[in-house]
C-alpha cells in the first residue's frame, strides 16, 4: 500500500482475511509501505481477529521480500506499532541464509483464567 495511516486498515484487512479463498484456514494480513531504507508494516492476525502490535513471521517475510525486490544483501529495519525490528540475513545466489529477527521483547498483557 502507499500509506498505512490514511487507510481503513481493519475493513481492508477483513475483506482479505474473510475472503472465501482463505476463510476456512484463515490468514494473517500484513500491509507494508516501502520507505526506501526501511519498511513500515501493520498486521491483522487470524485468531486475534484484529490488529496486533507486530508479527515476527510477517516481519521476516516482508523484510525478505523487500530485500529480494530491492537487491539488499544484509539487513532490513521494519517499523511496526510495537517498535522497530531488524531482520539480518545473507543473500547468496538468490537464496536467503542465516536469517535472524532482532528487537525488543516486553510484556503487553498479563491475565488469569479460572476454570
Stretch-by-stretch model annotation:
Residues 57:
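Short secondary-structure boundary segments
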